[in-house]
Structure formats: structure tokens, C-alpha cells
């Protein structure tokens, strides 16, 4: 007989439970109680025999509260590991274990009740013993445990195995919408949109909580239009996604369903409508940094900088000080908006806070960003320190040398600017920036001949700014 699926396993006691494909079988009866000590027992071998090996229970040690591990006075024949141990009523009391040595006068058996108690649970999909065999695993009989298996299985089994699990789930729980929803997600990913649509309609049909089914359909539609809009399917659109979210809210008003509508409206570039919905959610149980951040994006798209800033302030205010890393992305976003609004010193404050939180991951681009804010805020020494750090982290990026030389010229550090510009030229001799700032610093220092020569080189390389300086210093 072929094994259909595993129903459980225990490596410690070396037992497994499985289902077989068989049209007709006569099962043995499992004894309802443990065999007592001194009870007579018989070993039923795999092959038919006229007489059964007989023994006596010498010891019945209890494990896991009510199961017995038997020591039996019985010389165990070869090839009878896992064979049933029977009582005088013909019931199975145990399963034979591997003997310590051949021809030993004592043998061992584990309770048949224990073997029968093995079952598949929601997390059994990750059980090392079950995973060591490639035999198919059964789904749990309880719906909540089977759903847990599906959830965990998304990340722990290959796609073919997962699809097979889904089919088994739908066959066992045909009135549960979850199986159809999961299968629709897979079909959508495979661009089988008609199949996905059928599954979601079935999910809605069988669902007791139809609002949840409509909401799940809305999420699938939104993800498809967001990530696969180039693959047209006439029945699906963002309008359809919005319709499903609104139907979910009609059936059972919940903030999460309104939030879904806001997300879709934003994708449709209906920013004012989305912003209004977000505003209605600020005092709901969805209130969070992410909610305020999403709302701020609506204001940004509407060119409402003040509104965007206010929402980012609310976003950051959801975190207590001292901040944890979770606040870092939002602080950085606010810094970018402050920088764009020419509020340089406030931007620097946010960038300082971000650096403290993300010290191990900040890169050269971060220090260049803060350099720009510091230059705008006239924090020149801090700016020079940051551009030096950017150069240390990305020493072959000529832009940083050019920016450093530019600032050095601005603050009167002419000798330093000349050295920095020469480094820039060494790294990128075909770029104009190094020659421009070298020439400018030299002219400011009184070395007009060399300075004009370098300014003209910058002009040859396409820098139109050089013309202004050439004209200025030629006529002096």
C-alpha cells in the first residue's frame, strides 16, 4: 500500500503515524488502557506465522502523564521493529522498539496510545522530524490550525508544495474563504487574473464575514494595478478595488476599510479625497506614524508644504524621546522636506537625530546631504567636517572634492581649496569642477596667470560658469 500522507511523528520514541491508500483494510484495535506489569503479551510479526512470540511485561514506565514505555521479557525476532505488541484480548498495547542488542532476553515497546495520539498541528510544517521526510504532510483537522499551516507555509515550503496544500485545504474546508483568497493571490502573481477573479467571487459567496472577503479582494485588485498595470484585465481596475473597499465598509464600517479607500484614491491621484479620508482616521485605532506619513504624501502631491510639514510633525510626535530606530525613516523624511523649504538648521537637527539612531548604516550620501543643509544654515565648520567624512567613505567620488573646494573658496580657505581642487582633478581629469575651483582659488590668491589657465580649461570642458570668472579676472 502507498503512503498517502504523514499524520505525525516523534523522533525521541521513533514512531510515525501516516495514512495509506487502501480500499479495504481491517485495522487492529488499540487497547484503551496501558498493559499492567506481569501481563502476558504477544508480538505480531509482519509475516504470517503459526505461533506468535510470547512475553511478559516486566516494567511499564509512564511518560507524558499517561503513556507507557514497556520493558518486555521477550526475545525479539529479527525484522520485527515497529511490529504491534498485543494483549490477551487481541488489542495493540505497544509498538516494538529497536533492541539494544540482538538476541537480548529483554525487548522494549512504546505505547500504541502514544503513537495514535500523534497529530498534525498548525506549526508542524516546520517540525524537523516531519521535514526530514519528503512524504506529503496532512493538514490539521481544525480550521484555525490549518489556516496557521497555510500562513507559515508561505515562507517555509516551495511553491509547488504550497499549491498542493491549498488544494487540500479547499477540499477539506470548502466553505472557508481563506483557501480561495490564498489561491487567488497565487493566480494573480501568475497573471491568471480570470482564475483569481473566480476564486475571489467564491470566497465572497462562502464567507460568513463578507466584509472581510470584499476587503481582501480590494487588496488583491490594488496590488495587481499597482505592480502589474501593464497586464490589462478588463474586469479589474482601481475603480473596482475602490468599489470592493467601499462595499466592505458598507457591510461593516471599520477604519481599516476607509484606510484602504484612501490608499486607492492616492494611487488614482485623487489626493484631496484621500487626504479627507486620512483626516477622518487620525482619532481612530489606526492612528500611527505611518498613517500621518501617508497623509503627508497627499499634501506633498497637492503642493501644500505647510500641511505636509504639520503632518510629518505629527508623525514624529507619535514616538517618545529618546527616539528608537523605528522613528528614523520619518525623521529623515521630515529633514528632506525642511531642506527643500530652506529651513536648513531644522533640517540639520533632524539629520543629527537620524545619525544617532542609524550610526551603523549611514553612508557618504547622508553626510553629503547634511553638508548641504549645513551650508544653507551657514554652519560652515560642521559642513567641512561632514564633507570630509563623505570623502573618507567614498574617496573616488569627485563631486565631494568639488563641493569641499567650493566651500573652502567661499570661507576664504584659498590654500586648502587649491589642494582640494588638485585632488579633484587627479580623480576626474575630464570633469570641469576641479579646474573651475582651482582657477578661482588661484585668482583670489593673486595667481591670475595660473588661475585663468585653469578657468579656461574648465570652460573647454563645458563649464559655462567659467566665462564669468574669466571676464572678471582678465579685466582686473
Regions found by a protein language model. Give the residues of each.
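C-terminal cap/linker of serine protease catalytic domains
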Residues: 95-161
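Helix-start (N-cap) detector for alpha-helical repeat units in TPR-like alpha-solenoids
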Residues: 177-178, 210-215, 253-258, 288-290, ...
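Canonical tetratricopeptide repeat
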Residues: 182, 216, 260, 294, ...
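Register position in tetratricopeptide repeats
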Residues: 189, 223-227, 267-268, 301-302, ...
